[in-house]
Amino acid sequence: MFWKKDPTVSWERKNINDIDFSRFNVAIIGGTGGLGRAISRELAQRNARVTVVGQTFRDEDLKDKINFVKADLSLVSECKRISHSDEIPYEELTHLIFTTGIFASRQRQATSEGLEKDMAVSYLSRYIIFHDVAKRLGISRTKKDDLPKVFIAGFPGNGQVGDPDDLNSDEKKYSAYATHMNTVAANESLVIDAKDRYTNIDTFGLNPGLIKTNIRNNLLGSDTYLSRITEWIISWTCQSAETYAKTICTLIASPAIESRSGTMFSNKGDAILPSPGLTKDVVEKFMENSELLVEKALRNQSPFTSSNE
C-alpha cells in the first residue's frame, strides 16, 4: 500500500471484549455483504443496535439483532428513498458507515438512470444518502457528549485524484481502472469536503486495502476461475473481513478520534495522510459535478423503475 502515516493522530487499541457497544446505534449502508456484513455481525453480536441496507439479507442467525432494509443502491431514486426512509433511525444514530462498492466492469455498464454502474454504486449512493441525512444525523440521541460519526470506506490516501469532469465515464475512452479510481478519488473528496461542511458530525475515511470479498465479481466474473484464484491469493496474503471488522469496531469506539474529522485510516487502523493532489479546487469540482450527475439521473429516471427492484 502506498499511503503515509499521519503522526498527529493516534488511538488506544483496547481489547474489543472490554468495550461496551450497547450504547451504539449504527446504520451500515451496504451492510449485507463483504466488509459491511462483517462489521454489522461484529457489532450485532456485541449488543449494538444495527440497521443494514442492501439487496439480500444473509444473516438469519442474527435477524433478531439486525434490522434489514432492502434497497437497490445503484439507483439514485432508491438512494433518495432510503435517505428519507423511516426504517432507518438517522436522528438516533451514533454511527453511519458506508461500505457499498463494486469494481467497474471491463465493458462500461449503465444503470436504468443512465449512470455508469460502479460510480452509481461505489460513490453516488454514498454522496446522496450522506448529504441528505448529515444535518439531522443523531439529533435525537439520548446521550450527546460526543458527535455522531460517519465512516466512508474506499481507498483514500493513495494519491488518486481522478477526473471530476468525467464522473460518468462517458467523455473519454472507457477504462475500468480509470473509472474505479474516479470513485476512489470521489469518496476521499467526500470525506475532505465534509470536514468543513458538516461541523455537527465527525467524518472519516477508511482504507481496508485488499480483503477477500465479492467486490471484484463485477470485474472478474462471479465464481469464475480467475475470480477464484484471485480471491484465494488475497485470502492467503491479506487479512480477512472478520479481522478487519474487529479493528474497525474498536476504532469507531475510540474517544481519541473525537473532533478529528477528515482523518483517514489504513487497513490496520493507523491514521494516514490524505492524497496531496485532492486540493480544495479539485474537491469542490467533485462535489459540484456529483450534484449535476444526480440531477441528470433523476431526469433520466425510467417510469418503470420500481423501489422494489
From Swiss-Prot:
It is an enzyme of class 1 (oxidoreductase). Its EC number is 1.-.-.-. It is found in: Membrane. It is a single-pass membrane protein. Its main location: membrane. SUPFAM superfamilies: NAD(P)-binding Rossmann-fold domains. One of its GO terms (molecular function) is aldehyde dehydrogenase (NAD+) activity. One of its GO terms (cellular component) is endoplasmic reticulum. The chain crosses the membrane at residues 23-39. The keyword tRNA-binding does not apply. Keywords: Membrane, Oxidoreductase, Transmembrane, Transmembrane helix. GO terms for biological process: response to furfural. Belongs to the NmrA-type oxidoreductase family. This is Uncharacterized oxidoreductase YKL107W. It comes from Saccharomyces cerevisiae (strain ATCC 204508 / S288c).
